[in-house]
Amino acid sequence: MRLELGKIFIKDVQFGEKTTVEKGVLYVNKQEIIDLAMQDDRIKSVNVELARPGESVRIAPVKDVIEPRVKVEGSGAMFPGMTNKVKTVGSGRTHALVGSTVLTCGKIVGFQEGVIDMSGPIAKYCPFSETNNVCIVVEPVEGLETHAYEAAARMVGLKAAEYVGKAGLDVEPDEVVVYETKPLLEQIKEYPDLPKVAYVHMLQSQGLLHDTYYYGVDAKQFIPTFMYPTEIMDGAITSGNCVAPCDKVTTFHHLNNPVIEDLYKRHGKDLNSVGVILTNENVYLADKERCSDMVGKLVEFLGIDGVLITEEGYGNPDTDLMMNCKKCTQAGAKVVLITDEFPGRDGKSQSVADATPEADAVASCGQGNLIEHFPAMDKVIGMLDYVETMIGGYKGCINEDGSFDAELQIIIASTIANGYNKLTARFY
């Protein structure tokens, strides 16, 4: 499967009469986005605001973040099974408005939604302090059930991102990158002397607002499967969860997975990247046994030499992580885990909730329990009403001027366990 990704670099975002891209500036028609969102009768009101790097702006509670993209050539359309009919994606040509996002925020869905600061000392922890953000502030109708509100907000974000992405349809990209993964036997024959490496991609699927979707299917409902990495770049996987914000894999992070990106960069040089093994993180032990068994069988069946594993969330999913590690090792593969840590505020507790002797190679994406001071900002997009009850916050943490103290895990993507962040841990 071969995908050309045309990157259109966005250096600013402004409101305009027409949603278009001109000389690196993304112009968006505010009313058209509002009208699109208000087609859902579960939504009471919508506002659209802009947040740019360096501005004194805080965004909260953030639900999902999405990079606007559009299919130019090839099968299917963005977000199959969600905003478009189910059809295999990952081939042809796709344009991305790099440096911009569409994000949803507003009244909290669950307690695990996050904060983005566009400037100040906290901005360095979040990648979205460096992007030009179209912020959709959503308010649900009175009495709407929580799951229905999550679904409505999720669809508003995806539809708005697809709408904005179409502005790049006829724009000549600043850069075109080609990604190609061939059918398995052909791929193996191409580099027979290089180690065969697969990426085991664990999707959040604990339920109770901890959900991820594969071609529109709730990840709880499938068993491990094998897929082309480029399918993920075309929106085959979308976020639908309110997991702890620090390691929440937003839809943006699925589209821009750094593990996939780095495997492509090293493909044909020192490794043979053969594809993605997709699995989930269901809560019941029987599900964990079943799915980790199948991950191990796929690794054995495909003759994989090396495996990289990422998880989403912490606590319960740490067991899936360790079971996958153990069974991939038993299948004959060398395994590296990529995860974040939660050792407590004093740093003395066990960093993950489970362990196995086979987990002897780990890349850390940082720890989420460090307390930082969040200074007041001139503007808040959304609201700060829920800071005390959000993961990382605590009773009495917020001050009258809007400043507060909280753990890093309240920040979107601060310790995201696929490496799209700036934190890590080192031995001294």
From Swiss-Prot:
List Pyruvic acid (Cys) occurrences by residue. Answer: 242
Q: Which UniProt keywords apply?
A: Oxidoreductase, Pyruvate
Q: Which organism is it from?
A: Peptoclostridium acidaminophilum (Eubacterium acidaminophilum)
The UniProt record lists the EC number as 1.21.4.3
* Designated gene of the protein: grdG
Per the record, a Pfam family?
A: Gly_reductase
Q: Which InterPro entries match?
A: Gly/sarc/bet_Rdtase_B_asu/bsu, Gly_reductase_pB_sua/b, Sarcosine_Reductase_Comp
How does the record describe the protein's post-translational processing? The peptide chain is cleaved into beta and alpha chains, and the alpha chain N-terminal cysteine is deaminated and oxidized to form a reactive pyruvoyl group.
The reaction(s) annotated as catalysed by this protein in its Swiss-Prot or TrEMBL entry are: acetyl phosphate + methylamine + [thioredoxin]-disulfide + H2O = sarcosine + [thioredoxin]-dithiol + phosphate + H(+)
Top-level taxon of the source organism: Bacteria
Q: What does this protein do?
A: In the first step of sarcosine reductase, the substrate is bound to component PB via a Schiff base intermediate. Then the PB-activated substrate is nucleophilically attacked by the selenol anion of component PA to transform it to a carboxymethylated selenoether and the respective amine. By action of component PC, acetyl phosphate is formed, leaving component PA in its oxidized state. Finally component PA becomes reduced by the thioredoxin system to start a new catalytic cycle of reductive deamination.
Write down what this protein is called.
Sarcosine reductase complex component B subunit alpha
Q: Name one GO molecular function term.
A: sarcosine reductase activity
Q: How does it assemble?
A: Heterotetramer of two alpha and two beta subunits. Component of the sarcosine reductase complex, together with components A and C. PB is substrate specific.
